[in-house]
Amino acid sequence: MKLRVTFQWIEPCPNERLRVAQQRLLESIEALGLEPALFPAGPEMTKLAEILRHARRSSSSDYFVWCNSDVILTRNPFAIADRAKVHGFHRREVPSGELCGGVDMYLIPNVIWDNYLSRDIPDLWCGGSHVDWWLTRAPALIGAYESHNGFIDHPSHPESGASKRTSNPYFRHNVREYNAWARRNGAGLLEVPARLPLIGASMSPITDYLSWARRRLRGDRGQ
């Protein structure tokens, strides 16, 4: 039986870029002799826990792999599998060759998932930013994490609103849920400026002061 890689198969796709990207991902998985384990999804956001549980159920070995839907596999992640660690993979941007600080693919041993990760999963939207904060920090807390470069490429495109904008509800939901998990487990918190809904007005006097100071400094330099 072939080793399986799970990712969301989104249909209908919200845009042509993603439609092409997920097809290229599927082809890259098959080119490495692996089997795509598709998680059927629509254009709406999906909870990360649902995707990972699907990946675990679909596992044909002692490990499972999950990745984002718009990367391209260039090497077989199962080649470095070991039962003692979760492995995270940073993407390389194409065509720039820049390495991304975030993690877009994970190889997870079934035993670590069953006995540890699955027992306390924060309620994160996949695609809503910072899911890698949990999947990286949770195994790191028990000394069971290692990161790698050189396994996945990512054709560059403009950032999505859900991934970076602090006013985006999916972004803010993920930050809240991650921080709740982090407090329970003694991990580092994500800090973002507090903003009023809709109008985006800052609720933090410290943030206001720092923003004012930066504007003042830029103004002084321009004189």
State where each predicted segment sits.
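Structural alpha-beta junctions
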Residues: 27-37, 84-87, 140-147
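A short acidic (Asp/Glu
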Residues: 48-51, 75-78, 158
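Conserved catalytic core of nucleotide-sugar-dependent glycosyltransferases
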Residues: 71-138
